[in-house]
């Protein structure tokens, strides 16, 4: 495993940083999963509220965009409203999480088609990243089921489905980073791309996962406050809703990263491979 070891000085700095990350995890482990879940479902909660306050506007959009008539447009808005609020409540209460995630995934797919997001690569990347967050949420429930057999000796990775779901969720989070990139040749933009890509790659392969995810959460949160400060925009400006949408979708991905911090990268990761070998 020498290929994963840094030189002496760097190794010492990394060890200190990892110790700090572990200390953070120990202090927050009781409430971090709850914060992670709330962040992850925040985009659905915000969108459900928006559906309620823009009920007529959403129906009109569907009728004009798809020529579907009043009845189908009303069904669309009703499903988007109740299909987000109820699953969010189920997830926060830890009730039928698999069903709740399935409903939320159907909302993501439905909105991707209904709002023509398939042809907007930036918004499509965000939706895919949110799907990755839902996979991480499902993997968390697999972790809870596996814990019923705590204390029983096992060899290797005892929960393959959970490990592959964690891997898929981490990889899909890459799409959030891609949607945030601005290809401008300024020093700060190049620095953002290099640092962000390095961090998201480390999280995806599961190397120094908790440390990388903590740094990425801080980086994404700061970037989110800078790029998507929707509360500074007057309520009569149409792009306020777009900024709010971007803000809460980024918060959902941050929630996914917090789940990675809380539960680790799983069996299909460099960190786990190092432990076993």
UniProtKB/Swiss-Prot annotation:
Pfam families: SURF4
Transmembrane segments: 71-91, 97-117, 118-138, 163-183, 187-207, 213-233, 250-270
Protein function: Endoplasmic reticulum cargo receptor that mediates the export of the yolk proteins from intestinal cells by recruiting cargos into COPII vesicles to facilitate their secretion. Required for the endoplasmic reticulum export of the yolk protein vit-2, which is synthesized as a lipoprotein complex, from intestinal cells. Involved in endoplasmic reticulum exit sites (ERES) organization.
Organism: Caenorhabditis elegans
Record's signal peptide: none
Record carries keyword Cell cycle: no
GO biological process: Golgi organization; negative regulation of epidermal growth factor receptor signaling pathway; negative regulation of vulval development; nematode larval development; positive regulation of protein catabolic process; protein exit from endoplasmic reticulum
Description of the deletion phenotype: High rate of embryonic and larval lethality. Some mutants reach adulthood but display severe accumulation of vit-2 in large granule-like structures in intestinal cells.
Keywords, alphabetical: Endoplasmic reticulum, Membrane, Protein transport, Transmembrane, Transmembrane helix, Transport
PROSITE patterns: SURF4
Family indicated by similarity: Belongs to the SURF4 family.
UniProt keyword 4Fe-4S present: no
A GO molecular-function descriptor: cargo receptor activity
Name of the featured protein: Surfeit locus protein 4 homolog
Record remark on domains: The di-lysine motif confers endoplasmic reticulum localization for type I membrane proteins.
Short sequence motif named Di-lysine motif, residue ranges: 274-277
Compartment(s) where it occurs, according to its Swiss-Prot or TrEMBL record: Endoplasmic reticulum membrane
